[in-house]
Amino acid sequence: MHPPSPLNTQQKDWLTRGGSLTAHLRLLGQVQVQVQREHKAMAWLDEYRVLGLSRCLLVWVREVVLVVDAKPYVYARSLTPLTASYNAWQAVRSIGSRPLADLLFRDRSVLRSALASRRITAQHPLHRRACNFVAQSHATQALLARRSVFTRQGAPLLITECMLPALWATLEPVAAPRQASLSADGPCRHSAQIVSPESMLE
């Protein structure tokens, strides 16, 4: 098996950008949030580990595709303990097709963990979900994803964002300046402590 190719500058940049991913995507075109799933369920094993939750605990899950100019750029999955979806994170249940950034980056009580990122392969359930929006020629390739935990009133909200091939294809001919992208975050105080883009999603 060949070792994975190193990340290029664009990939490292997008995997480690703080602030709102939706705001960064808006620099590339018109963003639409397409909701795929909203329901209570069991979390995946790696998600239980990240949040330190018992494996029998139900969570509230929301999965969306972030589409830019009719192209799927990001498959995103968020979850919080089911009890928190009725309390600290109850707004997640009613946000509909608005981006979660509308909640996360306007509430100064919300804290954010460091970003962690990795390549995910076909063995991971997130890869299988995301590949519904990937051309067949890319379906077996590893995808790049990042995640962080937002905390409000002591309750966690885990958000995982899987970058799709259409995003990288758009960025190849257009090297957007870093400074321009950061200006889209506005006066948000949720600057994350960044970890290596090769670090594991727990």
Curated annotation (Swiss-Prot):
Query: EC number(s) for this protein?
Result: 4.1.3.40
BP GO terms, sorted: pyruvate biosynthetic process; ubiquinone biosynthetic process
Arranged from A to Z, the UniProt key words for this protein are: Cytoplasm, Lyase, Pyruvate, Ubiquinone biosynthesis
List localization entries.
Cytoplasm
Any Gene Ontology CC annotation: cytosol
> Does this entry carry the keyword Cytoplasm?
yes
Q: Where does the chain bind substrate? A: 62, 100, 161
Catalyzed reactions: chorismate = 4-hydroxybenzoate + pyruvate
Which Pfam family, giving just one, matches this sequence?
Chor_lyase
InterPro entries registered for this protein in UniProt: Chorismate--pyruvate_lyase (IPR007440), Chorismate_lyase_/UTRA_dom_sf (IPR028978)
GO MF term set: chorismate lyase activity
- Region Disordered: what ranges? 181-202
Classify the main location: cytoplasm
Family according to the record: Belongs to the UbiC family.
> What functional role does this protein have?
Removes the pyruvyl group from chorismate, with concomitant aromatization of the ring, to provide 4-hydroxybenzoate (4HB) for the ubiquinone pathway.
Name of the protein: Probable chorismate pyruvate-lyase
Q: Which organism is it from?
A: Xanthomonas albilineans
